[in-house]
Amino acid sequence: MMKAKISLITLGVSDLHRSLKFYRDGLGLPAHGYKEGNEVVFFEMEGSWLGLYPKDKLAEDATVLPEGAGFAGITLAHNTGSKEAVDAVFALAVSAGARVVKKPQDVFWGGYSGYFADPDGHLWEVAWNPFMDLT
């Protein structure tokens, strides 16, 4: 039986340096062992890892075509402990260059969330869920 855990999420990016600047310098995520010239960047998250890898190389590694546009059918989420924390994280992302997709607001399921897109268009939800502690 497979253990229910996601250990690494790798985002295919069009410009590694731009994405590194967004995640490391803008959002403040610590890049693990990154050296100039590396083709991949890893960020240690609490309980998992986030990787950035050139989109064409990631597609080649997975033996699929790199073309494609629009919604990919997946979003990433960062959950916080309060509405105020959602607003603070969202503001940090926007100041780092994120594109606002949906401003944080009260949502139908009783929580509070908003969406932004990173420089490559990957959608991130920043949310507070009063019913489940996902922090």
Predicted regions and their residues:
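Major-groove DNA-recognition helix of helix-turn-helix-type DNA-binding domains
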Residues: 27
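Vicinal oxygen chelate
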Residues: 1-8, 30-117, 128-135
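Conserved active-site tyrosine of GNAT-family acetyltransferases
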Residues: 19-24, 93, 121
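Conserved beta-strand-loop-alpha-helix junction that forms the acyl-donor binding cleft
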Residues: 13-16, 108-109
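Short phosphate-engaging motifs
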Residues: 18-19, 85
